[in-house]
């Protein structure tokens, strides 16, 4: 059954499943996954694009500038000192993993590195400066979007949206190269990458409008964000537009010392955002992190790839490859 579904949606073969699935793509595309290697084949691009996608490094380094904030950063600064390498199974740590990832990107000769949030366990000036320097020294273009930890000082009073804006402006702007941290796009060889901040689990009206405008361009799109979209059967870790995302299911707000999720769950805008993505004919894929485990879901023909956490060295090696359209009579 699974193989039939994939051939129906991605290769254009006519099967009875087409009556049950939304497979009406204007172009035919397919993909393959082997370990951390993802290959997307589509006639919608004319040149090969190579990406390294990483998320959740959880860099925690601090210096004397952190002294006044230690009560807000203590829990996360005590975490991820030693991790287990995803491949060698040997002990490693976030700094080693991050440097190794940059080296891998260089060896793979990627066109860009996409960093999908929680690169930092809290907005540490030392960690942000260290990461930015190593990325800049590599000479590889890199693009970043925030996760829920990058800007969060646990226990600091205030609404999450206000705290996010404050600490992005005060600490993280150097990671964005002048782009709008909430939403921006990057064009690579005719393909467009969309970076959208959903680190509060919610989407703003401005972000929804941005997405709709990008879909209207008809350019081939890849959506990059931290928190995965809800997929059928997934838990609230896949929290962007999850129907069970609400205060009654928020079991971490006391641990993370933040506001609980809203009692009534997501806004209609967030649900609309998900629907726009999975129904868009020109969205090739979604990439996300957050849950620290590798996963794949396909929603109305749109694959969502979630990467394992980079604190253990994991990343996705992604190649988008031109493919001549398949003619089906």
Residue ranges of predicted features:
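Active-site glycine-centered loops adjacent to acidic/histidine catalytic or metal-binding residues
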Residues: 56, 118, 147-148, 226, ...
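His/acidic metal-ligating clusters that form di-metal
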Residues: 93, 98-112, 192, 201-300
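Surface-exposed cleft-lining segments at the edges of enzyme active sites
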Residues: 87, 117-120, 191-202, 260-261
């Amino acid at each position: 059954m699974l193989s039939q579904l994939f051939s129906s949606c991605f290769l254009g073969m006519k099967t009875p499943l087409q009556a049950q699935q939304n497979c009406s793509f204007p172009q035919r595309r397919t993909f393959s996954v082997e370990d951390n290697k993802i290959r997307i084949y589509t006639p919608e691009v004319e040149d090969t694009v190579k990406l390294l996608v990483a998320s959740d490094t959880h860099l925690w380094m601090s210096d004397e500038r952190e002294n006044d904030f230690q009560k807000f950063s203590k829990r996360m600064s005590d975490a991820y000192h030693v991790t287990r390498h995803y491949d060698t199974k040997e002990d490693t740590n976030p700094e080693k993993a991050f440097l190794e990832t940059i080296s891998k990107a260089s060896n793979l000769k990627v066109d860009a590195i996409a960093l999908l949030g929680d690169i930092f366990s809290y907005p540490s000036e030392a960690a942000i400066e260290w990461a930015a320097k190593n990325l800049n020294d590599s000479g590889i273009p890199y693009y970043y979007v925030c996760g829920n930890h990058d800007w969060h000082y646990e226990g600091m009073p205030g609404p999450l949206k206000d705290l996010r804006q404050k600490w992005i402006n005060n600490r993280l702007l150097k990671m964005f190269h002048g782009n709008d941290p909430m939403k921006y796009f990057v064009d690579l060889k005719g393909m467009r990458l969309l970076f959208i901040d959903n680190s509060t689990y919610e989407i703003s009206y401005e972000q929804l409008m941005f997405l709709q405008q990008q879909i209207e361009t008809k350019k081939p799109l890849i959506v990059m964000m931290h928190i995965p979209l809800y997929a059928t059967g997934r838990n609230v870790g896949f929290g962007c537009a999850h129907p069970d995302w609400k205060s009654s299911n928020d079991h971490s707000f006391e641990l993370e010392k933040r506001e609980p999720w809203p009692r009534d769950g997501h806004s209609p805008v967030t649900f609309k955002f998900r629907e726009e993505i999975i129904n868009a004919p020109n969205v090739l894929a979604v990439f996300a992190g957050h849950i620290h485990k590798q996963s794949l879901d396909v929603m109305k023909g749109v694959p969502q790839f979630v990467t394992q956490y980079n604190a253990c060295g994991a990343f996705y090696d992604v190649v988008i490859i031109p493919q001549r359209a398949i003619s089906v009579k």
